Amino acid sequence: MKKSNIYFLLAMIGLLLNACTYDFIVKEELAPVDPTVDILFATQIAPIFTSNQYQCTSCHKTGGQAPDLTVANVYNSLNTLKLIDTTTPASSKILTFPGSASHSWAKLSASESQLILTWIQQGAKNN
């Protein structure tokens, strides 16, 4: 009788362990950013914020919530509000704030973050 209880218990534990699943999240592969090639703000960085992908400009527009991320004002806004830290680029708020609790839908992709980080490391030029 005791053996059947042990077998039953082992079978139940086996079923319970098989019921648990975990979906592995595949990490995004980063295309290497060549630090010797200048990253252009106007064509590579600004579109991340001004395109409709994250809908940043639905709130962050002229007369709306700061910073003003419209095409004409995005560079000045990022600098005026000190969202770019050229001393410690990885600590720049422009990298750490999107994706926070108040902006959970706006998480930058790993490749976008890497591109912005490299641009800041290159001096965050308005080119």
Regions found by a protein language model. Give the residues of each.
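Sec-dependent bacterial lipoprotein signal peptides
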Residues: 1-20
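Aromatic- and Gly/Pro-enriched helix-to-coil junctions and flexible linker segments
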Residues: 20-127
